[in-house]
Amino acid sequence: MPELHQSIAQHYHERTKYNPETLASKSQRLDWTKQPVPFKEYKIGSTFDLKPYIQEKPEAFANNPDAQWWQRLSRLLFRSYGLTAKMPSMGSAVYLRAAPSAGGLYPAEVYVVSRGTSLLPPGLYNYQCRTHSLMHYWESDVWQTLQAAC
């Protein structure tokens, strides 16, 4: 059987995902009464739903270059920072993420900067892992300002 080539995002995910055996053996007691809010939410802006593009069958979008672009972005975000499991615990859910951490519930946030394309208007976006979507929360062409700052 020929070896399948993985994308960089899939390779990263496979090497950093939690293993149930090591997760249980290295866990420490948590104070369940002091849980932070596990998701950052932006209440303003427009949402780009990425769920339709997470399909594992790339041929579903074979004749649609725009959908292929959305599928690549959807997979990159999911495999680098998406929710990979939901475990019930003490009356509430514990979410596991693709991103490795030292036990933090949300050690990072993922943002996308768009200079503006036919598919993604210019501005700043936050990846909403709970809903697997992009929140366009800052509608401005910030690309040139960021380039000048670098």
Where in this protein do the model-derived segments appear?
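N-terminal accessory segments that position/regulate proteins before the catalytic core
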Residues: 1-150
